[in-house]
């Protein structure tokens, strides 16, 4: 429904403007110029939610890590993203949006957690670099700078060296 999309787009615009006040110029102007949503032009918009009551009061894995259910939803979103890409369908995750507006516009019950608002559609091409890297907003971090072995900030270890070699030989990336 275009009216629903419009209300959600208005939420994006409000949140985007609010977020821009946290950034000083010239970075603010750069932030405001980034394409961070495709709500109106995408073929399909999907609000992905988590229902912590769906499987009853006991859900395996959530007693020690209560957020595990939301993490599982995020993994499902990643799988959807990969499948969309394989089918030449673009997918964007709009995170600059009010969950309260999503709840109101989509009549979500109070216990339902909005996890992601996704925009899917056919695109003319896929960029070789992610948008934020291409625009210079953020650099791509090397795997060795974000993965540690056994201890925080420990970058060396036999298993880690094996993993790095596998990546280098198979993906030409590490």
Spans of features found by a protein language model:
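Short secondary-structure boundary segments
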Residues: 50, 96, 122
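Short coil/turn connectors at secondary-structure junctions
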Residues: 41-44, 89, 110-114
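Solvent-exposed alpha-helices and their adjacent loops that cap or buttress functional pockets
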Residues: 37-40, 108-110, 139
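Glycine/small-residue-rich phosphate/adenosyl-binding loop
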Residues: 1-73
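C-terminal helix-cap and adjacent tail motif
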Residues: 117-174
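Small-aliphatic-rich amphipathic alpha-helix that forms the alpha element of a beta-alpha
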Residues: 46, 54-55, 59-105
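A glycine-rich helix N-cap at a beta->alpha junction
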Residues: 17-23, 107-132
């Amino acid at each position: 429904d275009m009216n629903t999309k419009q209300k959600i787009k208005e939420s994006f615009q409000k949140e985007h403007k609010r977020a821009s006040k946290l950034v000083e110029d010239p970075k603010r102007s750069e932030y405001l110029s980034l394409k961070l949503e495709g709500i109106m032009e995408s073929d399909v918009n999907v609000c992905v939610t988590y229902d912590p009551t769906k499987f009853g009061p006991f859900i395996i894995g959530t007693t020690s890590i209560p957020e595990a259910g939301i993490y599982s939803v995020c993994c499902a979103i990643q799988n959807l993203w990969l499948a969309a890409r394989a089918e030449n369908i673009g997918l964007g995750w709009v995170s600059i949006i009010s969950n309260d507006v999503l709840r109101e516009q989509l009549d979500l019950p109070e216990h339902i957690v909005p996890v992601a608002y996704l925009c899917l559609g056919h695109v003319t091409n896929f960029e070789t670099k992610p948008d934020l890297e291409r625009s210079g907003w953020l650099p791509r971090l090397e795997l060795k700078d974000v993965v540690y072995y056994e201890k925080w900030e420990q970058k060396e270890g036999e298993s880690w060296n094996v993993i790095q070699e596998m990546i280098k030989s198979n993906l030409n990336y590490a």
